[in-house]
Amino acid sequence: FMNVLDSTIVNVSLTHIAGDFAIAPNQGTWIITSYAVSEAIFLPLVGWLTKRFGVVRQYIWSTILFTLASLLCGLSFSFNFLLFSRVLQGVVGASMIPLSQTLMMSLYPKEKRGMAMGIWSITVIVAPVLGPVIGGFITDSFSWRWCFYINLPIGLLSGYLVHRIFKSRGYTETYEKSKIDILGLILLTLG
């Protein structure tokens, strides 16, 4: 939810952000683009990272780092630092959606997985719709920075709950040291 929400929550805040950093409004679109592109580039790495570090560990660290990147976005002192923080958000957030699906499937028995994915899908559908509404309210009532700070309690709670749930179930993972195809990654990124 948090990852998808962040793709649209700042859309209505772009003029406020542009005003704060004294940039042209059309430059503000880089805030959205930098996040989306970095997420798309790093999405193919999710499988490799999961094999190397495990699904639960990768999800928890992605969530925590995404939350920290959100904090950095909110604390941004310049437009370039905000762009850097958004790229970081995209990089670490790339694995959150596919891994949340994987974790969801491992929590439910086969006969309830359809229901679980239906509930999961509702959050993914609702988040982009609510993003501009929440972002507009937050920007008008507080500051555009709170569009990022809103992730702090959600991200920390999510990481903690996933850790507790899987630890209480005695979930164990296997890791394998696999090499990454650097040339393939470069070609994929350039494509």
Predicted regions and their residues:
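Residue-level signature of the transmembrane alpha-helical cores
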Residues: 59-65, 69, 85, 92, ...
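Transmembrane alpha-helical cores of Major Facilitator Superfamily
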Residues: 1, 33-37, 64, 71, ...
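Conserved MFS/SLC helix-loop-helix module at the cytosolic interface between two early adjacent transmembrane helices
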Residues: 41-80
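Extracytoplasmic
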Residues: 1-46, 96
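Hydrophobic transmembrane-helix bundles of small-molecule transporters
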Residues: 140-191
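Interfacial helix-cap and linker-helix signal at transmembrane-aqueous boundaries
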Residues: 17-18, 49-50, 82, 134-142
